[in-house]
């Protein structure tokens, strides 16, 4: 195992084309940080990947018969779940209803103050996504280009605001490890050497997605969703207001053994296996003694490519049961998260509560939500402080160390029991 001694940071800036570049101007533009313990809570898994990575990309660990031919075998390059670019709208009708997706004869409300915190949220659009001709035409046209509208979830931009942030646009074929600023210069060795030829960098995908959001086709199509009839995309300086970053859903996964990396290893080469989520309450009990918390979310696999939205020729949502028809997706059941999921066998002093955590790809479809990442983050923060205070590397924790960390978490209000 290797040992991280320092990380080097540099400012970034977005250029006029929308591409994020290194910003080396000024005496304070670069910073070197030394430390005893390092934590990678990133989406890209950059520190994990650059230090000493023994894991896999995307869904590489799936059964080979659930992968495309170019994802299989030792030279296979696996796909990553679709990304999204959030955008802002105004003109939402919060009284909108829609046919219930489980029974079209019934109606359901789309918007409400669901947390009673003064901020409204909304989710819906499955019926329109499946049946509305304008939405279908948009997806048929833009899907092959790597973009598609999906049923939405959205939130008001603060109490009483007329503006909303919307998660509705899928962006396919994005390599969450790949950034334009690593194409040249001092960091060119950091660009992934195994990027798929049909994939885009995060930066190029962000720029293209913003262009799609700025199109009249997009504006007309979103108005077909319930509550969106009079909605318009909010603009600033002539361009749509969008998220500063792409919402990535998957990048890399830390494995237990680098030599065992292969297709069909989702139940053997990860601290948290697929079955720990598929059969929670049984197989995950082996992790009870070293648990750091609970993962509580359903297995929510988004599309890996546009074709996943139309498994049998018609648009479907959600797509989990189609892309993984070989397994039975359970109802929500909490899963014990072991300490080994955030430690890595390849670096003595690195903790990974971010996307690169030691979870098989199918399990990551449940672990990828922010509340579950907060559970990992709480554990990593406590473990890092404990390691520094006790002068021990996180990878070398014994059972007494694990128990001590569990007690700190419990005393802080963390849930460690089902």
Which positions does each model-derived feature cover?
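N-terminal cofactor/phosphate-binding cores enriched in small/glycine residues
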Residues: 1
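Flavin (FAD/FMN)-binding glycine-rich loop and adjacent Rossmann-like elements that form
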Residues: 6, 13-37, 41-378, 383-416
């Amino acid at each position: 195992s290797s040992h991280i001694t320092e990380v080097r940071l540099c400012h970034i800036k977005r250029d006029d084309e929308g591409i994020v570049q290194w910003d080396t101007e000024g005496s304070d533009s670069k910073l070197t940080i030394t430390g005893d313990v390092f934590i990678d809570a990133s989406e890209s898994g950059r520190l994990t990947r650059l230090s000493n990575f023994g894991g896999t990309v995307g869904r590489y660990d799936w059964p080979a018969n659930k992968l495309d031919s170019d994802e299989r075998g030792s030279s296979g390059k696996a796909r990553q779940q679709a990304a999204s670019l959030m955008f802002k709208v105004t003109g939402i009708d919060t009284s909108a209803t829609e046919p219930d997706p489980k029974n079209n004869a019934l109606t359901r409300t789309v918007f409400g103050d669901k947390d009673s915190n003064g901020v409204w949220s909304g989710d819906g659009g499955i019926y329109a996504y499946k049946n509305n001709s304008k939405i279908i035409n948009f997806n048929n046209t833009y899907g092959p280009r790597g973009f598609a509208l999906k049923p939405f979830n959205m939130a008001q931009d603060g109490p009483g605001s007329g503006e909303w942030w919307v998660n509705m646009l899928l962006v396919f074929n994005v390599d969450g490890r790949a950034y334009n600023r690593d194409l040249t210069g001092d960091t060119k060795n950091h660009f992934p050497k195994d990027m798929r030829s049909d994939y885009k960098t995060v930066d190029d995908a962000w720029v293209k997605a913003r262009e799609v959001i700025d199109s009249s086709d997009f504006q007309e199509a979103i108005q077909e969703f319930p509550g969106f009839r009079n909605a318009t995309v909010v603009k600033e300086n002539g361009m749509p207001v969008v998220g500063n970053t792409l919402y990535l859903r998957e990048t890399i996964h830390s494995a237990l053994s680098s030599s065992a990396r292969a297709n069909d290893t989702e139940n053997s080469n990860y601290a948290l296996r697929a079955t720990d989520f598929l059969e929670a309450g049984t197989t995950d009990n082996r992790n009870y003694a070293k648990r750091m918390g609970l993962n509580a979310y359903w297995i929510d696999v988004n599309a890996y490519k546009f074709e996943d939205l139309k498994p049998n020729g018609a648009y479907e949502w959600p797509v989990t049961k189609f892309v993984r028809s070989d397994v039975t997706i359970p109802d929500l059941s909490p899963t014990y998260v072991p300490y080994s999921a955030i430690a890595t066998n390849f670096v003595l002093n690195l903790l990974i509560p971010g996307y690169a955590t030691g979870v098989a790809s199918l399990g990551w479809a449940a672990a990828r939500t922010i509340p579950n990442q907060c559970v990992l983050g709480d554990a990593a923060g406590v473990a890092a402080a404990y390691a520094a205070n006790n002068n021990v590397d996180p990878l070398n924790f014994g059972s007494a160390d694990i128990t001590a960390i569990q007690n700190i978490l419990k005393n802080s209000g963390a849930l460690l029991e089902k």
